[in-house]
């Protein structure tokens, strides 16, 4: 296997020793003499929240600090005497106060900040304003490039999905599923499997089987305070995110002034009767959602307000219903092109979710804090149903030349295709469900922080698991087929709902003419496992020099375990008559077109994962036995990452005091071990499989278990610099390295022999990640009240794309050659790393609250961001390709919001835009290119606060019922069209 470590294990051990030396030096140096200290909390007087990132300074001494996540600050090294302390925070009035202290004394001093806008009765709604200010403050104070949004910055979230906030950040494209729900993220052109999603810095587990995509449809925004998009990676954080890392940040339970706080939300989500919905959705229009939050601060074990606890309960039911159609056309860029494959679907899904999140922060001493977080999420789907009809010319597809004998009749137009009633003219009717999906996510995170003089230590231990059971449950997948029937598809009057007319042959509206296909009844029963165990220890030491500079070192360790299992089964029909159909089932297609294609319910023929009538079904027992082997995959990935870095400013005052830097290097050693079965060189015959299915499966797979491993070590340096030209103008420049790991499926055992070419294709457990060298530059301008303007440019040079079919050696001889003695002398073909590409772009962002405007306009605020990307390179191939030739690369995205507040009333309009992009690339023929059309999603939100404990809300999701659309080759050839529907969420929330 290819294995090209950049750093030897011996070199890695030396770096561990260096980390230990640095931490040891810090501990010994931390025992210096006592110094005067001013400490305390900074809060927002109106909201009673303690403020993170507030600046506390003594200007005469050029001494300053920022408050932490609990609103606490520490000014150390303060000489005896009286000093003026200045406290400032974006959107609030600065406060100056004289504070006196004796030599070596520790003085507590709290500050409550406010602003005139909070004192005006017509502006009662302050949560959103504070959220914007907190996000801008965190961004301004950040040492690296990141975008930050508060979860309350965009009003009420109709689904309370934290991902709905993330897609409003510059450079993110939200990937939607068939029901219109957010499934994943593309960041700066990098697809979801190449980006990391974290919670408080710890990796989240996914739902993608052997992939690396992290779906967020089970992560509620009620758990978090902010969403961060990290684009400039630093050595003390993971670099395994090619486009950017999305981090969901929870709130400390110590971060409030009150003794106790209770919040709640109750909403109902309805598919209104005046909007277009599929019939099965109309029967289940309304579903509910509720959250309850509890937060309290205690005086524990002799301390004062030193224990904070919070508990968040979340329960929701969500229903989706969508009609969509999928088509395929003749392989030509000219018009007309015949339509040879026409499908339409009704999809309904009912999701239930229950979350419990508990968090505690305990400050043992003024310099030591321990924390705990536990998350319990159950996400279930027990009524997913999909009805599919496919009319196609089997065996005569896009390259068919119509003639007197083909399925496609010559003389077709761009809107009308005629199909002959021949054997290759087929209609399949498939019903899937009701499917089951059970996702059980558990997370435990324990951490500590400790300060002693110039030394700060912190660490965490985390465990996260996602266990998924997915399949058909008591249902199944059933496909009934009719052959030798003809039809005419006429899209003249409606492309979405065309006429589908009979053209001879068997009557496709008569259920008696349909029979199940071979293996046409199946029951899926899969398990997916994703477990992440992490540990980290970080030490930071403030250097004894005049400039505020510190050194930081640490080591992070993470183990991921990913596995898939299956007990799926399938049956063939042995009966002679048609199966009973459901004459009462009404689909969207039948309602809109009147065509009466019969439908069947798969669950009628299953009972407790067995066929209801064994006398008319024959199971494929060989498939059942081999599935135990062919679907079993297990991968364990272990990452050990020490790092060293320095951070600070060039001086305390003047130009040097306004110039900061951060730089260092992170080393990551990755070790992979994978386990699974592969096929024997010679498989049993069909007759043997029928006569002895279990024995045949054993002979074909049981003796071919493979345990393979690989490793690599890489260094990831980064350098970041920033300068404050004025109090409001800031620039940043950074160079960083990052990477995207290969999917776990690329690491697991797989062998495909080719007897003709005497070659065997295998997977590569030592496959290297795709790497990127990143340049970022930004110009940022901040203005009061609560606003900023940012212009950014970035450039990524990406290397080591994953390429298959690369010769990587020759199989040796002997029984220990790794292939049970088989394939001696054969060529080994595997995946390897090759190719380069460049991705670059511009990002523009502007937001402001217009409280300086007169009269009612004072309540306006707005936000807009726009990202434009470009790319070129060979992407691991042999030819140069550009932006329009890279599948999944989204060149343009934008977001906008406009809100208005007056007294207790607020209104908000949200717009999310994604430009057209290539979804699938056909290098051999541009007519096979698949394009996703531009998409503009509009949400409208209204609320009225009767009192702090009661606010009424009304939100419209997908106001214009924007569809998801794709086309094949040319825009007139619609390949996919999906109306996810419009929903209205109404309810109330409050705080006590």
What are these regions (language model features)?
Residues 794-797, 802, 807-809, 813-921:
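Gram-negative outer-membrane beta-barrel transporters
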């Amino acid at each position: 296997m290819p294995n090209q470590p950049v750093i030897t294990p011996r070199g890695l051990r030396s770096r561990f020793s260096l980390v230990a030396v640095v931490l040891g030096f810090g501990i010994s140096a931390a025992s210096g003499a006592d110094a005067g200290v001013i400490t305390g909390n900074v809060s927002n007087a109106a909201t009673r929240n303690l403020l993170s990132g507030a600046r506390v300074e003594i200007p005469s001494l050029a001494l300053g600090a920022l408050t932490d996540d609990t609103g606490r600050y520490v000014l150390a090294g303060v000489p005896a005497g009286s000093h003026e302390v200045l406290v400032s925070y974006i959107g609030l009035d600065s406060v100056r106060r004289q504070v006196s202290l004796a030599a070596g004394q520790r003085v507590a001093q709290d500050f409550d900040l406010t602003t005139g806008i909070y004192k005006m009765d017509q502006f009662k709604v302050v949560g959103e304003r504070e959220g914007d200010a907190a996000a801008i403050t965190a961004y301004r104070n950040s040492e690296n490039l990141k975008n930050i949004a508060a979860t309350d910055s965009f009003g009420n979230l109709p689904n309370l999905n934290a991902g709905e906030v993330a897609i409003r950040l510059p450079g993110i494209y939200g990937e939607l599923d068939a029901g219109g729900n957010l499934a994943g993220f593309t960041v700066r052109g990098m697809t979801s499997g190449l980006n990391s999603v974290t919670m408080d810095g710890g990796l989240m587990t996914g739902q993608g089987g052997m992939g690396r995509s992290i779906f967020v449809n089970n992560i509620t925004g009620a758990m978090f305070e902010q969403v961060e998009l990290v684009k400039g990676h630093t050595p003390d954080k993971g670099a395994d995110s090619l486009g950017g890392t999305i981090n969901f940040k929870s709130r400390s339970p110590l971060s409030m002034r009150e003794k106790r706080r209770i919040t709640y939300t109750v909403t109902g989500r309805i598919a209104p009767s005046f909007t277009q919905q599929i019939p099965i959705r109309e029967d289940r229009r309304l579903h509910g959602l509720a959250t309850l939050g509890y937060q309290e601060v205690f005086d524990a074990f002799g301390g004062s307000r030193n224990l904070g606890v919070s508990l968040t309960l979340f329960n929701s039911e969500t229903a989706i219903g969508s009609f969509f159609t999928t088509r395929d056309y003749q392989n030509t860029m000219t018009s007309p092109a015949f339509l040879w494959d026409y499908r339409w679907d009704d999809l309904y899904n009912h999701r239930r979710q229950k979350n419990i999140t508990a968090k505690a922060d305990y400050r043992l001493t003024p310099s030591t804090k321990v924390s705990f977080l536990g998350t319990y999420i159950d996400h279930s789907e027990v009524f997913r149903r999909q009805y599919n009809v496919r009319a196609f010319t089997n065996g005569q597809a896009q390259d068919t030349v119509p003639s007197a004998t083909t399925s496609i009749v010559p003389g077709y137009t761009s809107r009308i295709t005629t199909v002959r009633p021949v054997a290759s003219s087929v209609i399949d009717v498939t019903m899937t469900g009701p499917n089951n999906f059970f996702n059980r996510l558990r997370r435990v995170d324990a951490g500590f922080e400790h300060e002693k003089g110039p030394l700060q230590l912190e660490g965490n231990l985390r465990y996260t698991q996602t266990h998924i059971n997915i399949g058909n449950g008591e249902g199944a997948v059933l496909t009934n087929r009719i052959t030798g029937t003809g039809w005419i598809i006429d899209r003249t009057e409606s492309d979405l709902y065309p006429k589908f007319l009979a053209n001879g042959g068997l009557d496709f509206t008569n259920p008696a003419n349909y029979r199940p296909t071979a293996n046409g009844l199946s029951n899926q029963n899969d398990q997916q496992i994703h477990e992440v165990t992490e540990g980290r220890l970080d030490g930071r030491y403030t250097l004894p020099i005049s400039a505020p500079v510190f050194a930081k070192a640490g080591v992070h360790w993470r183990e991921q375990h990913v596995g898939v299992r299956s007990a799926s089964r399938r049956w063939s029909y042995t009966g002679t008559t048609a199966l009973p159909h459901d004459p009462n089932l009404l689909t969207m297609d039948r309602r809109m077109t009147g065509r009466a294609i019969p439908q069947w319910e798969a669950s009628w023929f299953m009972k407790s994962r067995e066929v209801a009538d064994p006398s008319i079904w024959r199971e494929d027992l060989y498939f059942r036995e081999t599935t135990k082997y062919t679907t079993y995959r297990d991968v364990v990935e272990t990452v050990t990452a020490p790092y060293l870095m320095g951070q600070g400013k060039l001086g305390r005052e003047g130009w040097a005091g306004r110039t900061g830097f951060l730089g260092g290097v992170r080393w990551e050693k990755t070790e992979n071990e994978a386990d699974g079965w592969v096929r024997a060189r010679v498989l049993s015959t069909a007759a043997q499989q029928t006569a002895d299915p279990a024995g045949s499966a054993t002979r074909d797979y049981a003796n071919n278990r493979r345990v393979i491993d690989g490793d690599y070590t890489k260094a990831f340096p980064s350098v970041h610099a920033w300068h404050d030209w004025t109090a409001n103008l800031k620039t940043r420049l950074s160079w960083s390295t990052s990477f995207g790991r290969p999917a776990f499926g690329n690491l697991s055992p797989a062998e495909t022999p080719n007897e003709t070419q005497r070659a065997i294709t295998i997977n590569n457990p030592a496959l290297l990640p795709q790497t990127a060298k990143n340049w970022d530059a930004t110009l940022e301008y901040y203005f009061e009240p609560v606003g900023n303007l940012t212009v950014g440019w970035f450039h990524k040079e990406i290397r080591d794309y994953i390429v298959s079919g690369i010769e990587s050696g020759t199989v040796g001889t002997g029984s220990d050659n790794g292939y049970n003695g088989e394939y001696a002398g054969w060529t080994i073909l595997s995946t390897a790393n090759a190719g380069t590409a460049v991705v670059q772009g511009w990002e523009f962002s502007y937001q402001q609250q217009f409280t300086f405007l007169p009269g009612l306009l004072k309540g306006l605020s707005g936000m807009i961001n726009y990202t434009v990307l470009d790319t070129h390179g060979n992407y691991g191939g042999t030819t140069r390709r550009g932006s329009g030739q890279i599948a999944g690369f989204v060149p343009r995205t934008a977001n906008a919001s406009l809100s208005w507040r007056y007294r207790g009333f607020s209104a908000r309009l949200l717009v999310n835009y994604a430009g057209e992009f290539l979804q699938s690339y056909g290098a051999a023929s541009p007519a096979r290119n698949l394009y996703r059309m531009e998409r503009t999603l509009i949400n409208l939100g209204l609320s009225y606060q009767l009192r702090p404990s009661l606010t009424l809300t009304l939100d419209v999701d997908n106001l214009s019922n924007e569809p998801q659309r794709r086309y094949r080759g040319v825009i007139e050839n619609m390949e996919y069209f999906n109306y996810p529907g419009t929903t209205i969420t109404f309810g109330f929330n409050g705080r006590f």
